[in-house]
Amino acid sequence: MSNESIKAEQDLIQEGVESEVSTEEASLIDELTQANFRIEELEQLLADALAKVEEQKDSVIRAAAEVDNIRRRAAMDVEKANKFALEKFANELLPVLDNMERALQGTNPQDETTKALFEGVELTQKSFLTAVAKFGVKPIDPQGQAFNPDQHQAIGMQPSAEYPANTVMLVMQKGYELNSRLLRPAMVMVSQGGPSQESASINIEA
């Protein structure tokens, strides 16, 4: 076989090998391209899934917060209802307490004929006040205290050498509160002070 024939045969073999290699390379490139596309698709699906998870997590957190707020408001409403449910009933009891107070004021404890009555009414009043105090009802008796417009209702003012100005000198009717909430203000007479206090006031201003 001549050299030319050998060379021609080698060239054919090389071309065949190169063609086969090119085909395999093209196939590998195509597979890699498809794999990259699939990876991108999977990454996008994963990103979408994570976004949905975050969205659902936020929804769950918001829902839990709303449930907690509703539960807290409901508890406050129940507490408020329980605290002041007796308000109407307590107001109905005030005339009874007033009548017992007037009965004590109109009875002389030193008089043997009325002493037993006084002691009986006094004992009943104490028991009654103890009972209603368990439900938060307490009397407001501001005798000798500074006038407080939030708890006292002044029915007038009078000069007094005994009580300083703007001091409750006489309680006409006790007030009452329910769990620190005013049921009825105390009806009071307020001191204007005495002449000496008026002079002192003038001297201070001078």
Swiss-Prot record:
<dbReference type="GO" id="GO:0051082">
    <property type="term" value="F:unfolded protein binding"/>
</dbReference>
<dbReference type="Pfam" id="PF01025">
    <property type="entry name" value="GrpE"/>
</dbReference>
<dbReference type="GO" id="GO:0042803">
    <property type="term" value="F:protein homodimerization activity"/>
</dbReference>
<keyword id="KW-0143">Chaperone</keyword>
<comment type="subunit">
    <text>Homodimer.</text>
</comment>
<comment type="function">
    <text>Participates actively in the response to hyperosmotic and heat shock by preventing the aggregation of stress-denatured proteins, in association with DnaK and GrpE. It is the nucleotide exchange factor for DnaK and may function as a thermosensor. Unfolded proteins bind initially to DnaJ; upon interaction with the DnaJ-bound protein, DnaK hydrolyzes its bound ATP, resulting in the formation of a stable complex. GrpE releases ADP from DnaK; ATP binding to DnaK triggers the release of the substrate protein, thus completing the reaction cycle.</text>
</comment>
<dbReference type="GO" id="GO:0051087">
    <property type="term" value="F:protein-folding chaperone binding"/>
</dbReference>
<keyword id="KW-0346">Stress response</keyword>
<protein>
    <recommendedName>
        <fullName>Protein GrpE</fullName>
    </recommendedName>
</protein>
<dbReference type="InterPro" id="IPR009012">
    <property type="entry name" value="GrpE_head"/>
</dbReference>
<keyword id="KW-0963">Cytoplasm</keyword>
<dbReference type="InterPro" id="IPR013805">
    <property type="entry name" value="GrpE_coiled_coil"/>
</dbReference>
<dbReference type="GO" id="GO:0006457">
    <property type="term" value="P:protein folding"/>
</dbReference>
<comment type="similarity">
    <text>Belongs to the GrpE family.</text>
</comment>
<dbReference type="InterPro" id="IPR000740">
    <property type="entry name" value="GrpE"/>
</dbReference>
<dbReference type="GO" id="GO:0005829">
    <property type="term" value="C:cytosol"/>
</dbReference>
<dbReference type="GO" id="GO:0000774">
    <property type="term" value="F:adenyl-nucleotide exchange factor activity"/>
</dbReference>
